[in-house]
C-alpha cells in the first residue's frame, strides 16, 4: 500500500461525466470495487452501510431476495413522497439490489446540491451513481470470484418451555386475584406426561426456523481488447436459502459492455445485460409473519402430533404446516437492458455523446393454496385455511426508454481551466399489471388457473405511464488549480404536473479554495499536502409521490355507483378523489460547507461537511367535509429541515513489510418539522407535529413502578380506577390536562413525545493490513443514539396469545423491586394498563456491530505462474459476527427492530469460504 503524490488526482464519476478529485467543489463520496467486494454481501445497500458518512442504510429483514433495505441520504427528505436517493446504473435508473456487485467499477454518492442538481427534480434525496466495468486495451484477463457458506440468525429470543409457561400464567392469574389454571397439568408434565397427543410441549422456534441455510455466489468475467474494440463480459449466479422451509432466492446475471473505435473521432458503445431473479416463499402468510408466529405461540399448543400430523395450533393457525405443506408463491423477475451510445470528438476538447437505452422489467408470480388438515387430542379439527384451495396468477411489465444527448467542451488557457457541459434527456416509462385468481381446486397436480371453479374467478388490472423532458448544463472553471467555481442547472418537465407547474428549474452554485496551493502555505507543505475549503448552495426538486397523476381527479367503478335501466342493473363510475391542478414540485434548498484535507504525504486524509436541507412545498392531503364523500386532493403545504455534519478520516502507511490502514467516519443529522399548516400526523405510537422530529414516539411518561398501596392511593392512575392497580404496575406522570397543566388524572392529555426514532451518530470503522500475501480486514458499523419503541411479544409477556420469553422472567415482585418488567398479568385483549404506549417500552437502539471480518491469503506468483494463473487468493469471511447493544431486548436485533415485536425475519450471521482467481 505505497502512497504516491497522485492520490488526489484520482478521477471521480459525477453527473454526466468525471472530474479530478482535487477539483471537486461538491460533497461527493467515491467507493471503488475493492471496497464494495470486501464485505462479500449480495446487494448494494448492504455494501454501502457504514462506509459513506451521511448515508443511512438499514436492513430490515434477512429474507432471501427481500431484505427491505432502506437508503436515506442526509435525513428524511419528504413526508409523503419518495425519500430514497436516485440510483443510476450507467446513467439509467435501476435497483441497487439487482446488480451483480462483481461487475461494479465505482460508486459515487452525490450528497449536496452542487453535485446533484444536474439531476434536478429527482435529486432532492441525493444521487448514487453506479458505473459498471468496461474493457481495456491489452491481453484478455479472466477473473473468477466465488464463495459458499452458511447463514444463521444473528439472534433469536428464547421462548419458555411448557412448564415455565404454565407457571408464569398461574402467577399472572394469582396477581389478578384469579385461581391458578395449570396446577394439576404442571404435575402431569413434570411426571413425563407429554405425549404430543393430549399434552404438548411444542418447540415452535426450532420446528419452523432452521439453524442454518446455504448461501453461494459465483462470478466470472473476461476483460480485454485492442485499440479498436474493448470488451467486458461477465456472468454471475447468486443463491440463498431461507431460514424456513420453502423459502429461497436465486439471481442469474449476464453483462456485455463493448467499446468500438470507428475512426479517430467516432466511438461506438453497445452494452447489454440480462438478469433473472427467482423467489419462492410460503403462500399462506409472509415469511416474517410465519416466523413471528413461531416465536410467539405458546408451547402447550399442538404443533406436530406424535403420528406426524399437524396440530390445531391457534384456531387452525399452525406455522409448522404453513412452511412444510409445499404451498408456495413462486415469482420470476427477468430484466433486459440494451444501451447504444455514440461519441464524436470533431474538435480538440469537444465531445458529443448520444445514447439510447431500452429497459424492460417483467414479473410473474404464481401462488397456490392447498388447505392442511389439523388434529388435536387424536381428533380431526378441520382444514385450514377454511376458504379452501385457491390460485392466483400475477403479471407485470415495465418498459423504460431513455434518450441522452450531451456535449462537452474542455480547454486550458494558461492558468485558466474551463469545462462546459450542455445536454438534453428524454425519458418515458410504461407499466401494466394484471392479476387473476380462482378457488376450489379439487385435484392435485392440476394447478392451472383454468382448472379452478369459474364461478369464483376474480381479475384486476392497472396501467400507468410517466415521462420527463430535461435540459441540463454545467460550467467548471478553475484558476491556477487554486480557485474553483462550478454552476449547475437543470430544466425539467414532468407528466405528473400540468400547466405552468409542469416545468421547474433547479440550479446550484459552488466554489472551492485550495489553500494548500497558495504561496503562504509553502512552509506547511511538508505536513499538510492538501487543504481545500468548499461551499455550495442549490435548489433540488421531488416529484416522486405515489400517484402518477396527482393533479387529476380519480374515477372509480363499482356496483355501488350503478343504476337500474328498464329493470336491468348497470354498474357505474364516480369521482373518488378531488382534483388540484395547481400542485407542483416539492423543493429542497440545500447549503453545504466542507473541507478536504491530506497530511503527511497523503497518509492521513479525510473530510468534514456541515449541511442544511430546507424542504418546502411538501405534498399533503388535508381533510375535506364528510359530505363530499371523496378523498382529499394533494396540496403543496409544509416545510421541514435537516441539518447535520459528516466527518471521515483515513490513515494508511507501511511498517517494514506490513501495509496497514485505518478508516473511520461518523455523521449526525437532526430533523425538525417546521410547518404543517396546523396539521398533525398522529398514529397509535407516533406523532409528527410542528417543531418536533418526524415520526416521534408518542405516549405516556413512565415513572418507575408503584411500590405500595399507599403510593397508589396518593397518585393518579391510568383509567382512574385505583382498584385495578397494584404494586408492581407502571406509574405514569401527570404532566398536563385540558388547560395545559397537571390535573390529577392520567388520560390522553398526558401523552407527549417520548423518543426519537431517527438514528444519530452513525459510524463506521475499518481496519486492515497486508503482509507477505496475507490480508486481513475488520469492519465495525453502528449507531450511537436511536430510540426504539417495542410492543407485542418482544416486550410484553402473555400479551394477547403470546408466550413468555426466558428474559421476561425478570418481572417485579416485592423481592425483585428493580426488575426489568412489571408484575406478570395475563392480557388477552391487550388492555393491561402496563401495556400502554409509554416511555417504559422505549429502549436504546444504539449498537456497535462487527459487520464483516475477512482473512485471506494470496499464493506467491512463483507458484501460480506454473499453472498460468496470475493471481490466486483464498479467504474466509464472517458477517454480523457479534453486536454490542445498549440494554436492548434479548434475542432481538436493534438494526431491524420493529415496533410490532416478533413479526420479523431475523438478519443473517454469515460464514463463507471464497476463492479469487485471475488468468
Give the residues covered by each predicted segment:
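Short, small/polar-rich motifs associated with maturation and membrane association
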Residues: 1-255, 260-263, 267-271, 275, ...
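A structural detector for beta-sheet-dominated domains
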Residues: 2-4, 58, 74, 638, ...
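Structured loop/turn residues at beta-strand edges in well-structured enzyme cores
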Residues: 6, 26, 50, 97-105, ...
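Extracellular/periplasmic, surface-exposed regions of secreted and cell-surface proteins
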Residues: 10, 36, 84, 251, ...
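Extracytoplasmic assembly/pore-lining segments of large envelope/extracellular complexes
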Residues: 98-99, 359, 374
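Surface-exposed, extracytoplasmic segments of Gram-negative outer-membrane nutrient-acquisition systems
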Residues: 180, 188, 195, 369, ...
Amino acid at each position: 500500500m505505497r502512497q504516491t503524490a497522485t492520490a488526489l488526482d484520482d478521477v471521480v464519476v459525477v453527473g454526466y461525466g468525471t472530474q479530478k478529485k482535487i477539483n471537486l467543489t461538491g460533497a461527493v463520496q467515491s467507493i471503488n470495487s475493492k471496497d464494495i467486494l470486501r464485505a462479500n454481501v449480495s446487494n448494494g445497500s448492504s455494501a454501502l452501510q457504514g462506509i459513506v458518512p451521511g448515508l443511512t442504510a438499514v436492513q430490515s429483514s434477512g429474507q432471501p431476495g427481500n431484505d427491505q433495505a432502506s437508503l436515506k441520504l442526509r435525513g428524511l427528505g419528504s413526508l409523503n413522497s419518495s425519500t430514497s436517493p436516485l440510483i443510476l446504473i450507467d446513467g439509467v435508473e435501476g435497483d441497487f439490489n439487482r446488480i451483480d456487485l462483481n461487475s461494479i467499477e465505482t460508486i459515487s454518492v452525490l450528497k449536496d446540491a452542487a453535485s446533484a442538481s444536474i439531476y434536478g427534480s429527482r435529486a432532492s434525496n441525493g444521487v448514487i451513481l453506479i458505473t459498471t466495468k468496461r474493457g481495456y486495451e491489452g491481453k484478455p484477463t479472466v477473473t473468477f470470484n466465488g464463495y459458499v457458506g452458511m447463514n444463521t440468525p444473528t439472534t433469536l429470543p428464547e421462548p419458555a418451555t411448557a412448564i415455565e409457561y404454565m407457571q408464569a400464567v398461574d402467577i399472572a392469574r394469582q396477581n389478578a386475584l384469579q385461581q391458578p389454571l395449570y396446577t394439576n397439568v404442571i404435575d402431569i408434565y413434570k411426571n413425563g406426561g407429554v405425549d404430543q397427543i393430549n399434552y404438548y410441549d411444542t418447540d415452535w422456534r426450532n420446528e419452523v426456523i432452521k439453524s442454518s441455510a446455504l448461501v453461494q455466489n459465483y462470478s466470472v468475467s473476461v476483460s480485454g481488447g485492442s485499440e479498436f474494440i474493448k470488451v467486458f463480459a461477465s456472468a454471475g449466479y447468486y443463491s440463498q436459502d431461507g431460514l424456513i422451509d420453502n423459502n429461497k432466492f436465486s439471481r442469474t446475471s449476464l453483462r456485455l459492455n463493448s467499446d468500438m473505435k470507428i475512426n479517430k473521432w467516432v466511438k461506438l458503445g453497445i452494452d447489454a445485460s440480462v438478469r433473472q431473479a427467482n423467489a419462492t416463499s410460503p403462500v399462506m402468510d409472509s415469511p416474517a409473519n410465519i416466523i413471528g408466529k413461531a416465536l410467539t405461540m405458546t408451547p402447550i399448543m399442538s404443533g406436530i402430533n406424535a403420528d406426524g400430523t399437524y396440530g390445531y395450533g391457534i384456531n387452525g393457525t399452525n406455522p409448522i404446516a404453513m412452511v412444510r405443506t409445499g404451498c408456495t408463491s413462486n415469482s420470476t423477475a427477468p430484466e433486459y437492458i440494451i444501451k447504444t451510445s455514440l461519441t464524436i470528438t470533431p474538435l480538440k476538447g469537444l465531445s458529443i455523446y448520444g445514447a439510447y437505452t431500452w429497459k424492460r422489467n417483467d414479473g410473474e408470480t404464481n401462488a397456490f393454496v392447498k388447505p392442511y388438515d389439523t388434529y388435536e387430542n387424536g381428533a380431526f379439527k378441520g382444514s385450514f385455511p377454511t376458504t379452501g384451495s385457491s390460485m392466483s396468477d400475477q403479471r407485470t411489465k415495465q418498459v423504460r426508454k431513455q434518450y441522452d444527448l450531451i456535449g462537452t467542451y474542455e480547454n486550458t488557457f494558461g492558468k485558466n481551466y474551463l469545462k462546459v457541459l450542455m445536454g438534453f434527456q428524454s425519458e418515458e416509462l410504461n407499466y401494466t399489471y394484471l392479476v387473476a385468481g380462482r378457488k376450489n381446486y379439487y385435484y392435485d397436480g392440476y394447478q392451472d388457473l383454468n382448472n379452478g371453479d369459474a364461478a369464483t374467478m376474480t381479475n384486476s388490472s392497472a396501467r400507468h405511464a410517466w415521462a420527463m423532458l430535461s435540459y441540463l448544463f454545467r460550467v467548471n472553471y478553475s484558476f491556477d488549480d487554486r480557485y474553483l467555481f462550478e454552476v449547475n442547472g437543470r430544466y425539467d418537465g414532468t407528466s405528473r404536473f400540468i400547466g405552468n407547474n409542469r416545468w421547474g428549474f433547479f440550479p446550484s452554485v459552488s466554489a472551492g479554495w485550495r489553500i494548500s496551493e497558495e504561496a503562504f502555505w509553502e512552509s506547511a507543505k511538508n505536513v499538510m499536502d492538501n487543504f481545500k475549503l468548499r461551499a455550495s448552495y442549490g435548489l433540488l426538486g421531488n416529484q416522486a409521490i405515489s400517484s402518477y397523476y396527482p393533479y387529476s381527479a380519480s374515477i372509480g367503478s363499482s356496483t355501488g355507483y350503478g343504476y337500474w335501466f328498464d329493470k336491468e342493473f348497470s354498474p357505474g363510475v364516480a369521482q373518488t378523489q378531488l382534483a388540484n391542478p395547481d400542485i407542483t414540485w416539492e423543493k429542497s434548498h440545500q447549503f453545504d460547507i466542507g473541507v478536504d484535507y491530506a497530511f503527511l504525504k497523503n497518509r492521513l486524509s479525510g473530510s468534514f461537511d456541515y449541511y442544511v436541507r430546507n424542504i418546502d412545498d411538501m405534498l399533503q392531503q388535508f381533510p375535506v367535509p364528510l359530505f363530499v364523500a371523496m378523498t382529499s386532493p394533494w396540496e403543496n403545504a409544509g416545510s421541514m429541515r435537516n441539518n447535520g455534519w459528516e466527518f471521515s478520516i483515513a490513515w494508511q502507511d507501511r511498517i517494514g513489510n506490513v501495509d496497514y490502514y485505518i478508516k473511520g467516519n461518523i455523521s449526525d443529522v437532526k430533523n425538525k418539522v417546521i410547518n404543517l399548516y396546523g396539521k398533525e400526523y398522529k398514529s397509535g405510537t407516533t406523532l409528527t407535529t410542528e417543531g418536533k422530529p418526524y415520526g416521534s414516539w408518542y405516549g405516556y411518561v413512565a415513572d418507575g413502578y408503584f411500590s405500595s398501596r399507599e403510593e397508589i392511593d396518593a397518585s393518579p392512575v391510568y383509567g382512574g380506577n385505583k382498584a385495578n392497580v397494584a404494586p408492581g404496575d407502571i406509574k405514569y406522570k401527570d404532566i398536563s390536562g385540558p388547560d395545559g397543566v397537571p390535573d390529577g388524572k392520567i388520560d390522553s392529555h398526558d401523552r407527549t413525545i417520548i423518543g426519537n426514532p431517527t438514528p444519530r451518530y452513525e459510524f463506521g470503522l475499518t481496519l486492515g493490513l497486508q503482509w507477505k500475501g496475507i490480508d486481513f480486514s475488520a469492519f465495525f458499523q453502528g449507531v450511537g443514539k436511536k430510540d426504539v419503541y417495542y410492543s407485542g411479544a418482544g416486550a410484553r409477556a402473555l400479551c394477547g396469545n403470546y408466550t413468555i420469553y426466558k428474559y421476561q422472567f425478570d418481572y417485579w415482585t416485592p423481592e425483585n423491586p428493580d426488575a426489568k418488567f412489571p408484575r406478570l398479568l395475563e392480557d388477552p385483549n391487550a388492555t393491561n394498563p402496563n401495556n400502554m404506549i409509554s416511555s417504559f417500552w422505549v429502549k436504546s437502539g444504539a449498537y456497535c456491530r462487527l459487520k464483516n471480518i475477512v482473512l485471506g491469503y494470496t499464493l506467491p506468483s512463483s507458484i501460480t505462474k506454473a499453472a498460468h494463473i496470475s493471481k490466486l487468493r483464498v479467504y474466509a469471511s464472517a458477517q454480523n459476527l457479534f453486536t454490542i447493544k445498549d440494554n436492548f431486548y434479548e434475542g432481538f436485533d436493534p438494526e431491524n427492530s420493529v415496533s410490532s415485536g416478533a413479526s420479523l425475519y431475523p438478519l443473517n450471521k454469515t460464514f463463507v469460504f471464497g476463492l479469487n482467481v485471475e488468468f
